[in-house]
Design a protein with these regions (language model features):
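N-terminal pre-core extensions flanking Radical SAM catalytic domains
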Residues: 1-136, 151-152, 306-332
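Conserved C-terminal portion of the radical SAM core fold
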Residues: 185, 204-210, 230-332
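A structural signal for well-ordered alpha-helical scaffolds and beta->alpha junctions
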Residues: 42-48, 60, 88, 92, ...
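A short acidic, amphipathic alpha-helical/loop segment
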Residues: 148, 170-177, 196-200, 222, ...
Length: 332
């Protein structure tokens, strides 16, 4: 068994920590891009041991996601990566957790805005949806590291997400260092589009902009709090007009499941692909626990509790944005 993604990609978390891949579930790795160059990671025990196990047809513990998918007959992340290689051809980078939005289903590890909100909850003795752990804002970008990454001779594709990649300090410098034959892929919330950066991105032959859009209009505004639909749609159109390969990647959850037909139709009308990501955590947002699907009182109570906490903090109320969902939970 072979995983080209594991062998031919370098994946870095928002903290700078190397990771086997974007869906792996290994414990914290000691190797961090701020203290270990790429060769230290590619030669690390965590990575080499995982490769050896797969070669012997043994699933590493960190690869449970792909194991479960393949046993269920679902194409796994491993199987989708056959075109990777030879050498390090792909980068999956999260330069930090800087983000201007406070998405309902997200967590402070991926959003600096949620770090602030979480801290405000704790300081005011209010129950936080993210527990009592402490979180910090990360930004591991520096010019030396950017040059090392951009100089990989076999590099074919760079995937940038976050946080919000358009907020990364130094992103323009990094983009300027890359060979223009490298494919660029962004996962963006669509609220920010720097004109200077846009002109630099236009120099690349292949650019994919995947907009994280969870609904049309005020549905998206509620779920991805801090966004304004008119801004997102304007930037969406700019990227389409620039000739980029534009798609949308909604996170399918209880908050938007009832409105997905509308979003699918919108994507079809706009002529873009839609890649639906099914949320698994937190469980009170998972569609398997929707009140129109089961009667799990504990999980439903959690949904109501955390919805009310965030609604009161943000002074926005679910009944005004997602009335069908509010009615299903008896929220008025």
């Amino acid at each position: 068994m072979k995983c080209n993604r594991l062998e031919n990609q370098v994946c870095v978390r928002t903290t700078g920590q190397y990771r086997l891949c974007c869906v792996s579930s290994e414990p914290d790795n000691v190797e961090n891009i701020m203290t270990h160059d790429i060769s230290k990671w590619t030669g690390s025990n965590a990575r080499t041991n995982a490769i050896k196990l797969l070669t012997n047809n043994i699933w590493p513990d960190a690869c449970t996601r792909c194991k479960v998918d393949e046993e269920a007959g679902i194409e796994s992340t491993r199987q989708k990566s056959s075109h990777y290689g030879p050498g390090i051809t792909h980068l999956d980078l999260r330069f930090g957790n800087a983000c201007n939005l406070s998405c309902r289903m997200c967590w402070p590890g991926s959003s600096s805005s949620l770090v602030q909100e979480h801290q405000e909850f704790l300081m005011n003795d209010i129950i936080s949806p993210w527990g009592e752990s402490s979180f910090v804002v990360h930004n591991w970008y520096d010019d030396e590291t950017a040059l090392e990454l951009a100089s990989i001779p076999t590099l074919k594709e760079v995937y940038l997400t976050g946080g919000e990649p358009m907020m990364v300090k130094g992103l323009l410098k990094f983009i300027q260092l890359l060979d223009k034959n490298v494919s660029l892929r962004f996962n963006t919330n669509g609220t920010i589009l720097n004109p200077t950066l846009l002109e630099e991105i236009k120099k690349f032959k292949n650019v994919n902009m995947c907009f994280s859009i969870d609904g049309v209009g005020k549905i998206n505004d509620y779920i991805r709090w801090g966004s304004k639909w008119e801004d997102v749609y304007r930037n969406f159109k700019i990227c389409k007009d620039a000739g980029f390969d534009v798609s949308i990647g909604p996170t399918v959850q209880i908050l938007n499941e009832l409105y997905m037909p509308e979003l699918r139709q919108w994507a079809s009308d706009e002529g873009v692909d839609i890649f639906e990501n099914i949320l698994s955590s937190p469980d009170y947002y998972s569609i398997k626990n929707a009140p129109w699907r089961n009667n799990n009182k504990r999980v439903h109570d959690d949904f109501i509790k955390y919805t009310n906490i965030l609604d009161n903090k943000r002074n926005c109320f679910i009944a005004d944005y997602l009335p069908e969902v509010a009615n299903a939970y008896g929220i008025s």
